[in-house]
A protein has these predicted regions:
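Catalytic strand-loop segment that frames the active site of acyl-thioester-processing enzymes
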Residues: 1-41, 100, 150
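Alpha-helix boundary/capping residues
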Residues: 34, 42, 136-140
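Hydrophobic residues in beta-strands and at strand termini
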Residues: 9-13, 65, 114
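Hydrophobic beta-strand-centered segment that forms part of the acyl-chain substrate-binding groove
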Residues: 38-84, 88-90, 105
Length: 150
């Protein structure tokens, strides 16, 4: 069964910028952390990736702001798939940041691929990783790519 994975956080002092709201780098950090928490939850820990010599590589992030997140505010980051190639080699993912009152604060759309850390090249992910990723919910605008966008 597909699930939207989510995790709750609290904005910290180190996340703030000069304007007293969460800095853009913090959004990207929380998006990456949520992605890794999902992978960990389906059995792909950091140690698993290291042992198998593979990992995800993000090629592009697109961050869109809707509402500020301020210091000590609680927020949730969810995670879903928005596109992939049929072989699973490349993918597009979306993280949505929502406030405690369910207001959409930001979205991060990320394009990535699976990478062989020894050969230093993109790879088709192993079957068990593809099966784990298949548990992730797909967005309403999900698309399957014949070839990834350039």
């Amino acid at each position: 069964m597909r699930q939207i994975f989510s995790h709750e956080y609290r904005a910290q002092w180190r996340d703030m910028d000069f304007n007293q709201h969460m800095a853009n780098a913090a959004y990207l950090d929380y998006a990456a952390n949520t992605r890794m928490l999902f992978l960990d939850s389906v059995g792909f820990t950091a140690a698993t990736f290291a042992e198998r010599g593979l990992g995800p590589v993000i090629l592009e992030d697109r961050l869109v702001y809707r509402r500020e997140i301020r210091m000590l505010e609680t927020f949730t980051v969810d995670y879903q798939a928005t596109a992939s190639t049929a072989d699973g080699r490349r993918f597009k993912l979306r993280n949505r940041f929502t406030s405690a009152t369910q207001d959409l604060c930001a979205t991060v759309d990320s394009i990535g691929l699976w990478f062989d850390l020894v050969a230093r090249r993109p790879i088709i992910p192993p079957d068990d990783l593809q099966e784990a990723f298949a548990r992730l919910a797909r967005s309403d605008d999900y698309e399957e790519w014949d070839a990834p966008p350039r």
